[in-house]
Curated annotation (Swiss-Prot):
Protein name: 3-isopropylmalate dehydratase large subunit
Sorted UniProt keywords: 4Fe-4S, Amino-acid biosynthesis, Branched-chain amino acid biosynthesis, Iron, Iron-sulfur, Leucine biosynthesis, Lyase, Metal-binding
Organism: Syntrophus aciditrophicus (strain SB)
Cofactor dependency: [4Fe-4S] cluster
GO molecular function: 3-isopropylmalate dehydratase activity; 4 iron, 4 sulfur cluster binding; metal ion binding
Residues annotated as binding [4Fe-4S] cluster: 300, 360, 363
Role summary: Catalyzes the isomerization between 2-isopropylmalate and 3-isopropylmalate, via the formation of 2-isopropylmaleate.
Recorded superkingdom: Bacteria
Pathway where it operates: Amino-acid biosynthesis; L-leucine biosynthesis; L-leucine from 3-methyl-2-oxobutanoate: step 2/4
Length: 420
């Protein structure tokens, strides 16, 4: 019996000839990632374990993105721990404020993560890199510490669910809508500890930005990882960025799956996730009247240049409702520069938006857009749990960037088709 793409990548990072779901394995990592929230804990554990030098300074990546630029003394202390460690260890891939971006947008952009890689990160949305055809998953800080010390980490090989997407996307429908629809269909535990493998004829029409968004939110269905088979679109993205060899893997025709789920995308309209779970989804036509206090466009889910272009196309010549605070956060400095050169910032500023330097900021209730009790936000982020963006009595809704932009203009959740 053949292996899935996830099983193949895991196997190639061991000394085994094959792996099967349920096996416990030790695997070598290509990238071990930490951020300003999780890395300080890992550094402490690394030192407690007697660590003097990381296993490979080129493979340990440290990104201060969650509370940067630092919002307070505690966040400054967290970043200083990581910064000092990066300098001490001569870490190749440490990016300071002014150069840093939201980690899961920055690493692919820099060519740090490549197809066929095995990536662990002390951040649950590390699964984003599956869009490139890599095995990528989130771990705890102690596992990151072990990886920094040894270059290895243990896994239980996951079963795989194959999602077969067929058909053509409707207007204003993006990768965000596909993954929200899937999560709404299977639930937040519908893929618990399983690889979510995305296939079907629709995939060829998806941009890399769409694929990153879909893989990013695999964890919201409980997935161990999300993954795409690399193709010509992947190659076009990776080739100019890669500074080392990479490998394209694909599932064998006779690979075994725990489940196969077929999705007809022709039937999907823009989706909105209602509080307080990403699975609590409705089509835009079913939303009703939901007034808003804030709209956030950005994050590791939807802060790429394609996302900003989609929002700008809707906002051009329009202004945000005066009752709505509109915040736009490009995910990296490169995206920031591209948006500026393309005139997107003029559109955002004319719409009365606040434009931020790259940061995770409001997504995790960190800073740059915290909600008060009773306030309601629509965000292009990935989670809408109780208190996710501020007060426990606030509400967060999730959508794609075009819907977010239209909603900012109308002051309520709405699709772009409602604009005149």
């Amino acid at each position: 019996m053949g292996m899935t793409i996830t099983e193949k990548i895991l196997c190639r990072h061991t000394d085994l000839d094959e792996v099967r779901p349920g096996m416990l394995i030790n695997a070598k990592v290509d990238i071990a990632l930490g951020n300003d929230v999780t890395a300080p804990l890992a550094i402490d554990e690394f030192r407690k374990a007697g660590g003097k030098k990381v296993f490979d300074r080129d493979k340990v990546v440290l990104i201060p993105d969650h509370f940067t630029p630092n919002k307070d003394i505690n966040s400054a202390a967290q970043c200083k721990i990581m910064r000092d460690f990066a300098r001490e260890q001569e870490i190749t891939h440490y990016y300071e404020v002014g150069e840093v971006g939201v980690e899961h947008a920055l690493l692919p952009e820099k060519g740090i993560v490549l197809p066929g890689d095995l990536v662990i990160g002390a951040d649950s949305h590390t699964c984003t890199y599956g869009a490139l055809g890599a095995f990528a998953t989130g771990v705890g800080s102690t596992d990151l510490a072990a990886a920094m010390l040894t270059g290895e980490v243990w896994f239980k090989v996951p079963e795989s669910i194959r999602f077969v997407l067929s058909g053509t996307l409707n207007p204003w429908v993006s990768g965000k809508d596909l993954i929200l629809y899937i999560i709404g269909k299977i639930g937040v535990d519908g893929a618990l500890y399983k690889a979510m493998e995305f296939t079907g004829d629709t995939i060829a029409s998806l941009t890399m930005a769409d694929r990153f968004t879909i893989a990013n939110m695999a964890i919201e269905a409980g997935g161990k990882n999300g993954i795409f088979t690399p193709d010509e679109i992947t190659e076009a993205y990776v080739k100019p960025r890669a500074k080392r060899p990479y490998t394209f893997y694909a599932s064998d025709p006779d690979a075994a799956y725990a489940q196969v789920i077929e999705i007809d995308v022709n039937r999907i309209e823009p989706q909105v996730a209602f509080p307080h779970l990403p699975s609590n989804t409705k089509g835009i036509s079913e939303v009703g009247q939901v007034p808003l206090d804030q709209v956030v466009i950005g994050s590791c889910t939807n802060g790429r240049i394609e996302d900003l272009r989609a929002a700008a196309a809707v906002l051009k010549g329009r202004k945000a409702d005066p009752r709505v605070r509109l915040i736009v956060i490009p995910a990296t400095q490169e995206i920031y520069r591209m948006a500026m050169k393309e005139g997107l910032f003029d559109i955002f500023l004319d719409a009365n938006a606040a434009i931020s330097t790259p940061t995770c900021g409001p997504c995790l209730g960190g800073h740059m857009g915290i909600l008060a009790a009773g306030e309601r936000a629509l965000a292009t982020t990935n989670r809408n749990f109780v208190g996710r963006m501020g007060h426990p009595r606030s509400e967060v809704y999730l959508s794609n960037p075009a819907v977010a932009a239209a909603s900012a203009v109308l002051g309520r959740i709405a699709g772009p088709d409602e604009l005149k």
